[in-house]
């Protein structure tokens, strides 16, 4: 059912949001059966791409990560995405009453997870870790994620579309803050606790 909804949310989001709203998923189920799989897509893809293919900024010398270094970074990135989804869902649940929402934390997790699906799937671009390619795919996924957010909030939160617009904007702001925080934390970890080892060829 999850895979069916995941495909449906990509091709006909408005009707799929309505179907998702009629079902109930627990937070435990979402983390165990959905986030655990989706978060593995970018983590595993980047591990393979950075250790087996490598990347080149100037188009000449290619750089690869050592397997041990990439493995630690991949594991940290994997669990960081768990935390990011949980933080955004908590923020949605905390803000919902301001905009007239009366749903449970489980519904907030559902909204967060399905909205972020394009970003998780875009992680497949990590198999070819070239900056221009990853940024292009990431921007396309981000645009569609924003579209899913604005269409899904009024349906899942059961609020009018005008309130849903402002609520979606608030959620988007939180999401961008979490993204910046995730990037900053990654840079700090790479420079201190998880230093990366490279090899050029």
Predicted regions and their residues:
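A generic structural micro-environment signature
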Residues: 7, 16-17, 26, 37, ...
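Amphipathic, positively biased hydrophobic alpha-helical segments used for protein targeting
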Residues: 19, 24, 50-54, 119, ...
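Long, solvent-exposed, polar/charged low-complexity segments
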Residues: 13, 157, 161-162, 196, ...
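Selected alpha-helical membrane-embedding segments in polytopic membrane proteins
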Residues: 2-103
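Membrane-helix interface segments in multi-pass membrane proteins
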Residues: 45-80, 126-141, 181-201
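Juxtamembrane transmembrane-helix termini
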Residues: 18, 52-56, 100, 151-161, ...
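Hydrophobic alpha-helical transmembrane segments and adjacent short intramembrane/lumenal linkers
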Residues: 92, 99-174, 179-181
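Phenylalanine-focused residue identity feature
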Residues: 2, 28-31, 47, 77-79, ...
